[in-house]
Amino acid sequence: MWAQLITVRLKPGREADLPRLAAQLRAVEQPDSGLLRSMLMQDQQDPGRVHMLVVLESEEKAREREQDPRREEGLQAARAIMAEIFEGPPEFTDLTVSEDW
């Protein structure tokens, strides 16, 4: 199992746009992508700080998913939303899942 933690900062006042982004990302997902779970979370002390945790079967499946042409059109729309609401580029942290319960 493999995961990626994505951390971003929202532009001021853009918290209400997160459900729109989540819906767009959910819409582009393919049933055979290897995705096990996605979570979108806001920092309780700093709601402008957002974390997305994506858990996949393996890093190999994650890299295949990144290149899947079936997702491209929908991802363009998601990237447009991100450009509107994020203050800068996301920070990516790749994680090996040691235990899951």
Q: Residue ranges of each PLM-predicted region?
A:
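Short, flexible segments with low predicted structural confidence
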Residues: 1-2, 17, 33-34
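Short, surface-exposed ligand-recognition loops at beta-strand->loop->(often short) alpha-helix junctions
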Residues: 9-20
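Short, well-ordered beta-strand segments in beta-rich or mixed alpha/beta enzyme
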Residues: 3-8, 38-68
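An amphipathic, aromatic/His-enriched active-site/gating alpha helix that lines ligand/cofactor pockets
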Residues: 24-36, 55-91
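Intrinsically disordered, low-complexity segments enriched in polar/charged residues with Gly/Pro
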Residues: 14-15, 25-28, 40-42
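Glycine-rich beta-strand-turn "strand-cap" elements at beta-sheet edges
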Residues: 2, 36-48, 76-101
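Residue-level signal for secondary-structure boundary sites
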Residues: 14-16, 60-62, 100
